[in-house]
């Protein structure tokens, strides 16, 4: 097992370099660059653009360098100094911008993940064991609603309900009176009171999807010969269901780690913009729109690394959970 892990880690190194090169290339495919966007914005607002200043900025930012020179400078800074470059739009180091958003991003995403698993697991088991019952039809209906309704529509609906009927301020993770205030018990309580909306919204589609997957997998397992034999031998029903069928049907929950880890960082971008959440998703979106190449490239590289780590973790956990995978 250790040899397998070491080999997978070695494979990750060239994969990350390839992903960084492709992402850096894709970011530069649209015509123009950050300075082009800035000049267009200044011209639209009636400001004069000094050509000499533009040339000086191109020299400072290295826009006149060939593509491969820009890429090598960026990737060498990451490897040698942990320097992800400089954000043109924000005027700050990229690493500081990214890590400043990580706290709220991880809190919201991890709680959303727990919400998904806590809700989806019992409902999925119930729907598989009590197929075509009234409860199964109700959960199926709401599951399809959760899959069909866009997250930002659900966000607008819950914002209206929270403001209209609960008297809660909408948008952000704190009430206006706590904006910029130091952390205190009152601010923590207000923060927790605002968390339920993004947790439900971000977790809705994932919960609905995992319920359907778990229901289908567990239904298939419950009709296999070993389950029929266990029932014939008189094992209690809860043991028949929970000991092996549920354990095998949980594989999708574990394999989901491969896409959950990057999702923890990027989040649901449109929903975060609607809710005005201080997470990483809106920052990545803004960097892509403004062609802030080092900020956008660093985000994509981070998401790629988390995807590879998530796939490795899911493979290892699946091997521990399911002996069939371990032996193969």
Residue ranges and their predicted role:
Residues 2-3, 102-135, 151, 178-328:
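Alpha-helical transmembrane segments of integral membrane proteins
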Residues 6-12:
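N-terminal signal-anchor/signal peptide hydrophobic helix marking the start
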Residues 12, 20, 144, 160-161, ...:
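Residue-level recognition of pore/gate-forming positions within transmembrane alpha-helices
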Residues 16-69, 165-187:
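Hydrophobic alpha-helical transmembrane segments of membrane transport/permease proteins
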Residues 20, 24, 82, 125, ...:
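Transmembrane alpha-helix boundary and packing residues in multipass membrane permease domains
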Residues 22-29, 62, 76, 142-173, ...:
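Membrane-water interface segments at the C-terminal ends of transmembrane alpha-helices
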Residues 48-80, 275-287:
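Short hydrophobic, aromatic-rich alpha-helical segments embedded in or entering the lipid bilayer
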Residues 62-121:
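An internal, D/E-rich "acidic patch" concept
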């Amino acid at each position: 097992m250790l040899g397998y892990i070491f080999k997978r880690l070695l494979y990750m190194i060239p994969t990350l370099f390839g992903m960084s090169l492709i992402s850096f290339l894709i970011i530069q495919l649209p015509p123009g660059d950050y300075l082009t966007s800035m000049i267009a914005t200044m011209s639209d607002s009636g400001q004069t653009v000094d050509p000499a200043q533009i040339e000086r900025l191109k020299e400072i930012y290295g826009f006149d360098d060939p593509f491969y020179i820009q890429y090598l400078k960026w990737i060498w800074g990451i490897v040698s100094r942990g320097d992800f470059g400089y954000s043109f739009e924000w005027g700050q180091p990229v690493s500081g911008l990214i890590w400043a958003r990580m706290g709220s991003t991880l809190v919201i995403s991890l709680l959303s993940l727990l919400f998904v698993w806590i809700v989806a697991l019992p409902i999925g088991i119930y729907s598989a064991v009590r197929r075509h019952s009234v409860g199964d039809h109700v959960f199926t209906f709401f599951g399809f609603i959760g899959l069909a309704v866009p997250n930002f529509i659900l966000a607008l609906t819950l914002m209206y309900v929270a403001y209209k009927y609960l008297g809660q301020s909408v948008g952000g993770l704190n009430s206006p009176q706590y904006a910029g205030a130091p952390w205190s018990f009152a601010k923590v309580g207000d923060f927790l009171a605002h968390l339920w909306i993004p947790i439900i919204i971000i977790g809705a589609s994932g919960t609905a999807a995992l319920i359907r997957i778990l229901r289908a997998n567990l239904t298939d397992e419950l009709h296999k010969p070993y389950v029929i034999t266990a029932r014939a031998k008189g094992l209690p029903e809860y043991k028949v269901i929970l000991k092996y069928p549920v354990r095998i049907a949980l594989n999708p929950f574990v394999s989901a780690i491969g896409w959950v880890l990057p999702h923890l960082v990027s989040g649901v971008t449109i929903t975060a913009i609607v809710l005005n959440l201080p997470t990483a998703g809106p920052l990545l979106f803004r960097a892509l729109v403004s062609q802030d190449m080092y900020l956008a490239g660093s985000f994509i590289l981070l998401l790629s690394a988390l995807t590879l780590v998530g796939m490795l973790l899911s493979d290892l956990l699946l091997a521990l959970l399911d002996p069939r995978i371990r032996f193969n």
